From Swiss-Prot:
A Pfam family: PGM_PMM_I
Keyword tRNA-binding: no
InterPro entries named in the record: A-D-PHexomutase_a/b/a-I, A-D-PHexomutase_a/b/a-I/II/III, A-D-PHexomutase_a/b/a-II, A-D-PHexomutase_a/b/a-III, A-D-PHexomutase_C, A-D-PHexomutase_C_sf, A-D-PHexomutase_CS, Alpha-D-phosphohexomutase_SF
NCBIfam families associated with the record: glmM, PRK10887.1
Cofactor, free-text remark: Binds 1 Mg(2+) ion per subunit.
The protein's name: Phosphoglucosamine mutase
Protein role: Catalyzes the conversion of glucosamine-6-phosphate to glucosamine-1-phosphate.
A biological process term (GO) from this entry: peptidoglycan biosynthetic process
Recorded name of the encoding gene: glmM
Native species: Bacillus pumilus (strain SAFR-032)
Active-site residues from the entry: S100 (phosphoserine intermediate)
Alphabetical list of PANTHER family matching this protein: PHOSPHOGLUCOMUTASE (ALPHA-D-GLUCOSE-1,6-BISPHOSPHATE-DEPENDENT), PHOSPHOHEXOSE MUTASE
Amino acid sequence: MGKYFGTDGVRGVANSELTPELAFKIGRFGGYVLTKDKERPKVLVGRDTRVSGHMLEGALVAGLLSIGAEVMRLGVISTPGVSYLTKAMDAEAGVMISASHNPVQDNGIKFFGGDGFKLSDEQENEIEQLMDQPVDQLPRPVGADLGTVNDYFEGGQKYLQFLKQTADEDFTGIHVALDCAHGATSSLATHLFADLDADVSTMGTSPNGLNINDGVGSTHPEALSVFVKEKGADIGLAFDGDGDRLIAVDEKGDIVDGDQIMYICARYLKGEGRLKDNTVVSTVMSNLGFYKALEKQGIKSIQTAVGDRYVVEAMKKDGYNVGGEQSGHLIFLDYNTTGDGMLSAIMLVNTLKATGKTLSELAAEMEKFPQLLVNVKVSDKYKVEENEKVKAVIQEVEKEMNGDGRILVRPSGTEPLVRVMAEAKTKELCDEYVTRITAVVKEEMGIE
């Protein structure tokens, strides 16, 4: 990670860390790096429903105009909507203003290249180097060469038309409960499933600028669980603030996470002959039960570091078409270039319709191992990988597990923490293993 760019673009508290001044620089220098080979580059800009979105959009767009870009403002739209439209409309770049599942005070800015994919580390480093130069030496067009800005709010409808084409058949007879987190999918998802002839009940669809992700959405699926049971829905679909994640709820109100959704869809696509190389790409955080269930179905798996960008990189490299994270970032590369909550929802409902099974029946085919994750505050998180005593206790625990469990000890990507995760046959064993390992981590490098 760089000075400004984290694992998913630039993010911070709006108007305090992510200021309008910084947004202007990101627009100016980021826009230049992505469009410097084009005389009048087209750049699409979308945002979620946060109150700070208008402020940051104005500053970001000003930066883009200062390098001569033709900016098209999409208004409120999901992150995957920006990704799709950037490629579909032959734009040089796309920008999304959102902090995804974070609380309302945060916001963020993430770029997409003309191919619809997120930026590489090299591109982000180039942007940061330009931003930190003592003197701004970028060209400054004047007069007719200055950039222009226009609204293209029809972009959302163009994106919905694309999504509708990914449904194998209409959804007549399926009662869908949606939780849109008072975010970017609030209007889009409701129209999408109604147009596909599903019976639709909604919650989290009344954004006021301040209530995004507040007790709703994919990070709070328990709210949808209650709603599904109240409405008697067949399936609940929870998105996050910018619509790039999906967590589902079955007809009994039980939560179905990203691992389970990936397994369900991958198994169905394999049966249809549509799973490339019979392989799924996931991160090291996926549940051990996920891998065992895939293996049972003759499906191979590849693991990457945590972060959907690393999943996408592995998929692109070897041509795989299904991947994702337990958190609900699910990528179906045949259709879109990034995690897409609404697309994932269609893939899941396609499977329900085709199999005639309930979501609880499909989810039961993957037996999840009990999992426990504990964060330990440390003085230097990177030293954990070299510490001999930590390595020794991990080896000791793994020997006891004898293949019926898994240990993962890694530094956090964003905080001064070491994450200790255990999966085992029982919750009691998870507790025991994590307690033993965290005790050694604290003793060796912990801080109060």
